[in-house]
Amino acid sequence: MASSSHPLIKFLVLSVVSFCIGTLHGMLQVMPPIRHWLDTIGSPYGGPGHMIDPLAHAHMNLVGGVVLLAMGVTYYLLPILSGRAIRSRRLTNATFWLTALGAYGFYFTQMGFGIAEGLALHSAPETIAPLHHYYGPTVALCGTVMAAGFFCYLVNIALTLLSRPVPRAVVLSVREAPKSALR
């Protein structure tokens, strides 16, 4: 893992970025003026505020932070622990990009619609319904992309576990295993 071009480093980097965004989001949403505004628009029990807190905040931390980290760690450790090469580098890359795009799309969809509908709730409530018309398809698209990333991950792990073990010489050390184990 000495090289920054390691195929799994992107999982770690985006996990850290996601935790930073989620932490900043969490700190901002408890500041009294922001918390008051969120409470007036329905957070955390419904309404536009619910999109910002807890939906956007939780998904950034859980999917962007924890899930991407867990996926990267699994891809790193599985060859070492099982003696099997990760079945597909393409599926590994698809796992990362689909999960990342889905999670960030979901986050920004929740934030964008939450803020827009929250502002409209106080100034022009009649504009919420036409705006909300686009919310369902947008969040469904992002969720589907995220789910496709999860599916690629599960398929790749299953194919790896069902494959034949590689000779132990291929999995020499913790440092070299992922490089030699990812095709």
Residue ranges and their predicted role:
Residues M1-R183:
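Hydrophobic alpha-helical transmembrane segments of multi-pass integral membrane proteins
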